[in-house]
Amino acid sequence: MKVLSLLYLLTAIPGIMSDVQLQESGPGLVKPSQSLSLTCSVTGYSITSGYFWNWIRQFPGNKLEWLGFIKYDGSNGYNPSLKNRVSITRDTSENQFFLKLNSVTTEDTATYYCAGDNDHLYYFDYWGQGTTLTVSS
């Protein structure tokens, strides 16, 4: 996980990014037991042309957790610890992909990032800026 954190810092340095841009959007606040839906809009590259399109979250205290991906061909992979709660889908016409997380609790409070990687070896080539989610009643 330390390697993942370091790679995140390296890829986040201004000037390293290319013309591919990712932008997350979401509700900001969700009540416990509700579902969370987030959107990642990709510009500069078609999500059907290549890459794994991932969702990752960073908890308060900076721990990172990979949630899952949707591949360019539409196939999925998920973190086994969240497999029953998480779903990642896409809209190819809008060049967007989505995260749905069911039955949220306060433990799901985090900053959520979308990211693209070419080889799925825990190095993420492109990152969004992140969207903060708070779970609170």
From Swiss-Prot:
GO molecular function, one term: antigen binding
Disulfide bond positions: C40-C114
Keywords: Adaptive immunity, Disulfide bond, Immunity, Immunoglobulin, Signal
Pfam families from the UniProt entry: V-set
Superkingdom per UniProt: Eukaryota
Annotated spans, Complementarity-determining-1: 49-54
Keyword Disulfide bond listed: yes
InterPro entries found in the cross-reference section: Ig-like_dom, Ig-like_dom_sf, Ig-like_fold, Ig_sub, Ig_V-set, IgHV
Cleavable signal peptide: 1-18
Region (Complementarity-determining-3): 117-126
Region annotation Complementarity-determining-2: where it falls in the sequence: 69-84
One GO term describing the cellular component: immunoglobulin complex
Annotated segments matching region Framework-2: 55-68
Record SMART domains: IG, IGv
UniProt-annotated stretches for the region Framework-1: 19-48
UniProt-listed GO biological process terms: immunoglobulin mediated immune response
Chain residue ranges for the region called Framework-4: 127-137
Region called Framework-3, residue ranges: 85-116
Additional notes on this entry: This alpha chain was isolated from a myeloma protein that has anti-dinitrophenyl activity.
Name under which the protein is recorded: Ig heavy chain V region MOPC 315
